[in-house]
Amino acid sequence: MLGQSIRRFTTSAVRRSHYEEGPGKNLPFSVENKWRLLAMMCLYFGSAFATPFLILRHQLLKK
């Protein structure tokens, strides 16, 4: 009896957990607006590129 109720709960939980399908729907950010996506990617990759230079500048200016 307990096993049946657990099985019923898990199958109903799986049925309720449907998500949207299609290109870009499984990403943690939206790809619908290409200009916002471009700005976010430039910010992300630009900050990763600039970090070593900013650290170097900080170390050189330190007294």
From Swiss-Prot:
Pathway: Energy metabolism; oxidative phosphorylation
Name recorded for this polypeptide: Cytochrome c oxidase subunit 7C, mitochondrial
Record: transit peptide: 1-16
GO biological process: mitochondrial electron transport, cytochrome c to oxygen
Topology with respect to the bilayer: Single-pass membrane protein
Pfam family, one: COX7C
Membrane spanning stretches: 34-60
Residue numbers bearing the N6-succinyllysine modification: 25
Known function: Component of the cytochrome c oxidase, the last enzyme in the mitochondrial electron transport chain which drives oxidative phosphorylation. The respiratory chain contains 3 multisubunit complexes succinate dehydrogenase (complex II, CII), ubiquinol-cytochrome c oxidoreductase (cytochrome b-c1 complex, complex III, CIII) and cytochrome c oxidase (complex IV, CIV), that cooperate to transfer electrons derived from NADH and succinate to molecular oxygen, creating an electrochemical gradient over the inner membrane that drives transmembrane transport and the ATP synthase.
Phylogenetic placement of the source organism: Eukaryota, Metazoa, Chordata, Craniata, Vertebrata
Chloroplast keyword on record: no
Mitochondrial matrix compartment residues: 17-33
